[in-house]
């Protein structure tokens, strides 16, 4: 999550969340003009005929008034399901996974002490998802705590503290070194939220992070489409990736190829502690454990990616929905059914 319903409750009716949604809630934003774009880009290879499972998954996604993509891979057998899996998407908070991995790699290398405490200053507070902004400045969480909050509650304050500590360019160098060419962290949360104000007046580029925090978000309840234009402009995305790349990134994490065994276990635990369970785990969460990371700007964006710990072995799933014009509950329900479709199909054919 980046933006939450707490913001809407404060009169910021145009925003919601860059993380996910366990509290089956949604907010309303002005729908984008025109239908979602789902066509295969010119020059792309003709996709193979879909399997029955792929056809089912695609039908569910295509029923949504949104740009969508999906990728699933059974780590044990290597079988895959993909629907527009190579289409670049606005990740919103899903990209925080890369920040987490770099933090643990730095810990493994001795560059970061996870037990070290960081005193949160007023200028480090960020609006949107998370709980740290609700506390009085001066709180001193450990870096391990900050990572946990960045993933489990998609805390934006924790995210920017970690980006400042690790270095944004280093996140992208890590992704480059792992051959994830479409996956990028584009900016800080502070710059992302400042950009909303810059749309209204270029002079707002001079606002400090604390001034942006104190202002909150502009009211778009009159339906001007302010937030729609913002989140669909690819130059202003917080993060960028494809369903395939994020799925393979999660596979590498689960296989222990991104960090030490101890760090891998801590990252797995952080994903399992995710508090927003209304998408991928919605219909399968009582059957299997799902370690996942959501990403939202409701109701226009609702993403969920994760590792499904099925009895026969782990399955990675990545679902992106951008430019959604329908209610969030329908989007959440569709992704929940897609996850159930994949789990059911592969559980009976192992």
Residue positions per predicted region:
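A short, well-structured edge-of-sheet supersecondary motif
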Residues: 52-85, 116, 308
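C-terminal motif of bacterial Sec signal peptides marking the signal peptidase cleavage site
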Residues: 17-20
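Active-site SXXK
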Residues: 78, 89-118, 246, 317
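N-terminal secretory signal peptides and thylakoid transit peptides that target proteins
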Residues: 1-15
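Mid-domain, small-residue-enriched loop/turn segments at the edges of structured enzyme/sensor domains
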Residues: 67, 139-142, 147, 159-255
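Second-shell loop/turn segments in exported
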Residues: 47, 82-90, 130-137, 145-149, ...
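Active-site-proximal loop and beta-strand segments within enzyme catalytic domains
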Residues: 105-148
């Amino acid at each position: 999550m980046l933006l939450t319903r707490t913001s809407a409750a404060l009169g910021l009716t145009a925003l919601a969340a860059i993380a996910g949604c366990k509290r089956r809630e949604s907010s309303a934003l002005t729908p984008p003009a025109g239908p979602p774009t789902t066509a295969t880009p010119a020059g792309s290879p003709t996709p193979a005929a879909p399997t029955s499972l792929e056809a089912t998954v695609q039908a569910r996604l295509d029923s949504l008034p949104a740009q969508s993509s999906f990728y699933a891979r059974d780590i044990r057998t290597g079988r895959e399901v993909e629907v527009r899996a190579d289409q670049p998407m606005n990740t919103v908070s899903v990209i925080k996974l890369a920040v987490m991995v770099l933090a643990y790699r730095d810990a493994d290398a001795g560059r970061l002490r996870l037990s070290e405490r960081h005193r949160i200053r007023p200028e480090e507070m960020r609006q949107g998802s998370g709980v740290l902004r609700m506390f009085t400045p001066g709180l001193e969480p450990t870096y391990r705590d900050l990572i946990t909050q960045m993933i489990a509650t998609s805390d934006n304050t924790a995210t920017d503290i970690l980006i400042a500590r690790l270095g944004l360019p280093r996140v992208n160098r890590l992704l480059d070194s792992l051959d994830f060419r479409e996956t990028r962290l584009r900016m800080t949360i502070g710059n992302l939220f400042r950009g909303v104000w810059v749309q209204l007046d270029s002079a707002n580029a001079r606002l400090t992070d604390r001034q942006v925090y104190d202002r909150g978000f502009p009211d778009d309840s009159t339906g001007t489409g302010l937030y729609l234009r913002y989140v669909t402009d690819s130059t202003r995305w917080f993060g960028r990736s494809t369903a395939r790349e994020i799925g393979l990134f999660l596979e590498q994490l689960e296989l222990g190829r991104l960090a030490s065994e101890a760090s891998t276990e801590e990252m797995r635990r952080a994903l399992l502690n995710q508090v927003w369970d209304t998408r991928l785990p919605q219909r399968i969460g009582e059957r299997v454990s799902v370690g996942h990371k959501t990403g939202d700007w409701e109701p226009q964006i609702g993403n969920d990616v994760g590792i499904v710990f099925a009895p026969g072995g782990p399955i990675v799933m990545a679902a992106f929905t951008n430019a959604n014009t329908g209610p969030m509950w329908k989007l959440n329900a569709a992704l929940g059914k897609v996850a159930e479709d994949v789990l059911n199909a592969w559980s009976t054919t192992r």
